[in-house]
């Protein structure tokens, strides 16, 4: 596949479906772009474009929810950039076989997600939920803890986020096992894990791990990948942390293994239905930590994402290959 785009012979037209600070609009315009921003709020139905997109070249949107039906209004788009790492909403057959290039924000969220994951590991290891639970009743008693330097962490989905998690876990002295689709493909994170194995070894890894982190994308292969059969392969009394995608877990099965205490606890940042419905029993379970798909966020989130997009736009103008090109067949 040729990733370089044809040099622009006209003013490139960028259509942005997110509310971004004016400073970034000005930077793009200074580079010669025509920029139109029409924000699509998270809690809104998809708005119809209020401008003519016939000559639009580039769309900046959220691949986690935008199915790109808007391309019917923008037939000449060459490049779509997703402000999210996930692009599952875009993966329709017609679009997957098109020539439109897709890039995502991979790398922009790795550090905050890794820091969130380590916070959750430490929360369970030091018994912090018990401290919070005991305080209103003024209960003073020994709280069981786990020493991380003698614990094993399994990172399922050893990509950029998984590597960032492993790096920080190693600093705490943990034994780290990375599990990925292609364990022989070098990605620069080999020295962050004690061992890297293929997905065919996942059951062996789960049986060994005291903490298991899911950092998987949403694809046909990963949907409901983590079901009751797989959860029961996990070490009894271990913990599950999901910072990948909600639909990789069968939630009803997770509830079962938490209630029967096969697993000691779970920290979930992503869910099959978001926002998590108020009546969902995860809210009531003492051994479940719920975060509102917030692990990715940091005060620098916008800065990192827009700098990546601007860097890529400069490459586009120079007819050079873009960063973070997504394989539309694989979904990542």
Residue ranges and their predicted role:
Residues 1-101, 227-229:
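An N-terminal-biased, well-structured beta-alpha scaffold segment characteristic
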Residues 2, 24, 103-116, 130, ...:
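C-terminal helix-to-coil terminal segments
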Residues 11, 34, 152, 174-175:
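Residues at the starts of beta-strands that form the adenosine-phosphate
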Residues 39, 83, 101-108, 200, ...:
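Short beta->alpha connector loops at strand-helix junctions that form conserved
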Residues 57-58, 79, 211, 239, ...:
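Short, Asp-centered acidic motifs that coordinate Mg2+ and/or phosphate
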Residues 97-152, 164, 171, 186:
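Phosphate-binding beta-alpha-beta segment of Rossmann-like dinucleotide-binding domains, i.e.
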Residues 158-159:
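Glycine-rich Rossmann-fold phosphate-binding loop(s) that bind the pyrophosphate
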Residues 183-281, 297:
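Rossmann-like adenosine-cofactor binding region
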């Amino acid at each position: 596949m040729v990733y370089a785009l044809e040099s622009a012979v006209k003013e490139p037209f960028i259509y942005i479906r997110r509310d971004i600070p004016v400073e970034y609009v000005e930077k793009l315009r200074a580079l010669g772009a025509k920029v139109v921003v029409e924000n699509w709020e998270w809690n809104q139905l998809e708005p119809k474009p209020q401008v003519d997109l016939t000559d639009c070249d580039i769309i900046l949107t959220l691949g986690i929810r935008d199915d790109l039906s808007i391309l019917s209004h923008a037939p000449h788009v060459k490049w779509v950039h997703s402000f999210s790492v996930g692009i599952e909403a875009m993966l329709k057959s017609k679009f997957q076989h098109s020539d439109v290039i897709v890039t995502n924000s991979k790398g922009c969220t790795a550090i905050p997600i890794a820091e969130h994951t380590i916070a959750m590991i430490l929360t369970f290891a030091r018994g912090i939920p018990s401290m919070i639970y005991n305080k209103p009743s003024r209960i003073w008693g020994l709280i069981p803890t786990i020493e991380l330097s003698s614990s094993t962490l399994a990172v399922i989905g050893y990509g950029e986020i998984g590597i960032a998690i492993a790096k920080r876990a190693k600093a705490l002295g943990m034994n780290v096992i990375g599990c990925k689709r292609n364990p022989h493909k070098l990605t620069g994170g080999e020295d962050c894990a004690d061992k890297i194995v293929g997905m065919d070894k996942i059951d062996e890894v789960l049986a060994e791990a005291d903490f298991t982190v899911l950092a998987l994308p949403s694809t046909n292969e990963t949907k409901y990948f983590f079901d009751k059969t797989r959860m029961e392969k996990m070490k009894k009394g271990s913990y599950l942390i999901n910072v990948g995608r909600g639909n990789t877990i069968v939630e009803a099965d997770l509830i079962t293994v938490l209630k029967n205490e096969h697993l000691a606890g779970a920290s979930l940042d992503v869910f099959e239905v978001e926002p998590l419905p108020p009546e969902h029993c995860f809210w009531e379970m003492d051994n479940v930590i719920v975060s509102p798909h917030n692990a990715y966020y940091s005060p620098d989130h916008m800065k990192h994402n827009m700098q990546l997009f601007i860097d890529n736009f400069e490459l586009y103008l120079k007819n050079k290959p873009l960063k973070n090109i997504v394989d539309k067949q694989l979904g990542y």
